């Protein structure tokens, strides 16, 4: 499997594994974090060849970007940095998103909001350009913030050299088509895992049509596919994973049974279960980029081992069939 992959029609190339930094933003969603440890984790990733680092203003209400900015300052030219626009907590809009970190967060993809979001991100990240700039969440009513205005602003920022590529997150096929009718969309970021492959049917065809890359988040289903979870694992009542249908007891039992069947492969390839899952995920769609979160250097060290794997086609096919059968059983 090809280790390096191009992003859309750009000249940007990166190993298929990137590092997600939502967790290092801390807060009520992820709990308290050690910023010094987070910085060491990012530095470890850079030293081990991870190129793409993804963040967003709303992760920890600016905290993730601040930590990432400190960590990459001496290595900015060696990495690709993506962040996002479109979620506001400083002012109210007619489009409420959700409460995050005790604040009301709203969607806003107007020209003024995008430019303000970018300048705030540049300051927190201590850089003068962003490699990939995503619209984080789309507004359901484009009469409120016309997509023409949004895309025109992004294209202008690209001309100004403040961003290098345009991305969109949490989209539909119709929205991708609309973006692409207005200019070049380079990449989308969507939830995707071996358990949740809905974008393969719904979004992949339109992405291939317009040469748009896909970056997957939550490939390990919030830790469920790491091998560290058992049927006896108990989540606290406030744990967000209670809302993940795959964590439900019945589904979890079937999932853990399949993971157990992968043990011979982890032994054959001398790798962790996470390595296998990330590899299988990256191999499941053409040119897929996989975003893996990490809070400790040892997690980075393990994730990077995936890039040295080279699974035999027969093994890849057998494991893919196991997950296809699993998906059919837990629908």
Segments and roles (model prediction):
Residues 1-80:
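N-terminal binding-site loop/beta-alpha segment at the start of enzyme catalytic domains
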Residues 9, 71-76, 122-126, 179-183:
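Acidic (Asp/Glu)-rich catalytic clusters
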Residues 10-29, 84-104, 134:
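N-terminal small/glycine-rich loop or linker at the start of catalytic domains
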Residues 16, 52, 129-132, 165, ...:
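Residues at the N-termini of beta-strands
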Residues 23-35, 100-115, 142-143:
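Active-site mouth loops of central-metabolism enzymes
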Residues 32-45, 110-124, 171-178:
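Short, acidic/polar
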Residues 122-141:
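Active-site groove signature of glycoside hydrolases
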Residues 138-331:
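Beta/alpha (TIM)-barrel catalytic core signal, keyed to glycine-rich beta->alpha loops juxtaposed to Asp/Glu
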